[in-house]
Design a protein with these regions (language model features):
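Flexible, Gly/Pro-enriched loop and linker segments at secondary-structure and domain junctions
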Residues: 1-8, 22-24, 41-47, 55, ...
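Flexible, P/S/T/G-rich "lid" or insertion loops adjacent to the active sites of thioester-utilizing
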Residues: 1-20, 110, 208-213, 241, ...
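His-Asp-centered acyl/peptidyl-transfer active-site segments
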Residues: 15-27, 37-142, 172-176, 277-280, ...
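Carrier-protein-dependent adenylate-forming modules in NRPS/ANL systems
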Residues: 37, 67-69, 78, 98, ...
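Conserved acidic residues
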Residues: 120, 319, 328, 411, ...
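Active-site beta-alpha turn of Rossmann-fold NAD(P)-dependent dehydrogenases/reductases
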Residues: 286-287, 375-378, 411, 417-418, ...
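Adenylate-forming
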Residues: 287, 334-337, 417-420, 442-445, ...
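Conserved AMP-binding/adenylation subdomain of ANL enzymes
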Residues: 385-414, 422-462, 477
Length: 495
């Protein structure tokens, strides 16, 4: 690929810096361009030396070129003349070593064949052109082949009229024509920027083309206005729209949106009677069932935050979480109660049956700035730590999901993720802001691929979540017949 600097731009730039030879200026521009392209302020380039020491060598025939590694160190606060002078000083020192074969450097450095090469792109400054000045003849030389190119090779031709031509050779296995063309446009734009502003610092030069800047602005234009709403607000609004639609089910219970709201409000009042105030936290140690979902919604309705306790965790882990978080109340079952009875000062609410409902006005005590839940880290880097996640963050996530992967009233979402895993949050709430249905897998069923096949088929699940390892096990358990029969409704899988 042959390039020419924008008309007059390189000449204008050289006029601003008369103390800098044009060859040095061109080298500084290209090394800066390469460094900014690859995101490296320090890299090794190859520089071609003639290796013709003395007048006799200058007229000898045959190829004697040598390529030596040039350490390029870019500084963001440096201007172009300073960079050009530094590189020129480096090359002056290197010239005395131009007879030191690159192959010998590899051997002397103890490098093995195939290891990281001495340099990446190769640079060459040619202070001549291809035109031959012969009496009465207009002639031009042509380079038929330069040999294989490992990465990039650039030959710089600063001409006597102040222009700059560049020959760019590239490894076709690494670069295509479209990529090289765009990189070339960036180099031309870089030259124009310095011509317009000679004092521009190297770190301030813009590498994006105008259309790329526009594209980036549009691609990153993701700002949205988040409504001042809470999780309970969104669910209540949907319940008003579709009160008799199917909302929540497990193997033993089924609730419409109206019935679910009645249970949530009843539980919120029960929590208030137990002393739970807005801003408090309530621990939940329930096996997977409709009551686990109702408990989380009831806690949010009361303005509190839930602390999920996976009943599959060891007792010591659960005790540590309770001691750290100091919840106001623990919602559990009679079967689980024995695990917590010796924790000093802990109040309990056993919850495994629907509550009596009334016409009580919904509390709606949660506010957007309230904490929605507390989740503990895995502890892989030390003691697990509790993290408080706010209502606004979850509302933002759920509205984004509904915008990108919209659920409808025809969707059935599987709740199979343990409640101690943050991914479970969208399972517990997303369906209820879209009029969809949430179905609860049996406790521990998420570990059994065959049980999940039966579960998906029984409820006609359309949307589910898998961690990659479990998805692999699930797929391995399928046969062509079972996939068609058990998964005929499934359309969305989140990893």
């Amino acid at each position: 690929m042959k390039l020419s600097a924008p008309a007059g731009a390189f000449r204008q730039l050289a006029a601003h810096m008369p103390e800098i030879p044009r060859a040095d200026l061109a080298l500084a521009l290209v090394t800066l361009w390469l460094g900014r392209l690859c995101g490296r302020m320090d890299y090794a380039a190859g520089f071609i030396f003639m290796r013709r020491m003395g007048s006799a060598a200058l007229t000898a025939t045959g190829p004697v070129l040598n390529v030596l590694p040039l350490a390029v160190n870019l500084h963001a606060t440096e201007d172009l003349p300073t960079l050009a002078k530094r590189l020129a000083a480096q090359l002056k020192k290197m010239r005395r070593h131009q007879r030191y074969d690159a192959e010998q450097i590899v051997r002397d450095s103890g490098r093995a064949a195939g290891e990281t090469p001495l340099f990446g792109p190769v640079l060459n400054i040619k202070v001549f052109d291809y035109h031959l000045d012969l009496p009465g003849i207009q002639a031009q030389t042509h380079t038929l082949a330069t040999g294989p190119v490992n990465d990039l090779e650039l030959a710089l031709f600063p001409d006597e009229n102040g222009g700059l031509d560049i020959e760019l050779l590239a490894n076709a296995q690494r670069y295509d024509d479209a990529t090289l063309s765009r990189h070339a446009l960036r180099l031309m734009a870089l030259i124009t920027q310095f011509a317009d502003n000679p004092a521009l610092r190297c770190g301030d030069a813009q590498m994006l083309l105008a259309e790329e800047q526009t594209q980036l602005a549009h691609l990153n234009n993701t700002a949205v206005t988040i409504p001042a709403a809470t999780l309970s607000d969104l669910v209540a609004q949907q319940a008003q729209k579709t009160p008799e639609a199917s909302a929540l089910a497990d193997a033993h219970y089924h609730f419409t949106y109206r019935e679910m709201r009645e249970q949530v409000v009843a539980l919120a009042y029960a929590l208030r009677e137990r002393g739970v105030q807005p801003g408090d936290s309530v621990a939940v140690a329930l096996p997977r069932s409709v009551f686990l979902t109702l408990a989380l919604h009831g806690i949010v309705e009361a303005g509190a935050a839930w602390l999920p306790l996976d009943t599959g965790y060891p007792d010591d882990r659960l005790r540590m979480m309770l001691e750290d978080a100091q919840p106001k109340l623990l919602i559990t079952t009679q079967a689980q109660l024995a695990r917590f009875h010796d924790i000093p000062g802990m109040e309990y609410l056993c919850y495994s049956q629907p509550l009596p409902v009334s016409d009580a006005t919904p509390l709606r005590l949660s506010l957007p700035h309230h904490t929605a839940y507390i989740i503990f880290t895995s502890g892989s880097t030390g003691r697990p730590k509790g993290v408080m996640v706010g209502q606004t963050a979850i509302v933002n996530r759920l509205l984004w999901m509904q915008d990108h992967y919209p659920l409808t009233a025809d969707d059935v979402v599987a709740q199979k993720t343990p409640c101690s895993f943050d991914v479970s949050v969208w399972e517990f709430f997303w369906p209820f802001i879209a009029g969809a249905k949430l179905v609860m897998a049996e406790p521990e069923a998420h570990r059994d691929p065959l049980a999940m096949q039966r579960f998906f088929a029984q409820y006609g699940v359309t949307t589910t979540h898998f961690v990659p390892s479990m998805l692999a096990a699930f797929i391995a358990s399928l046969t062509p017949a079972s996939a068609g029969e058990k998964l005929r409704f499934l359309k969305a899988r989140f990893l």
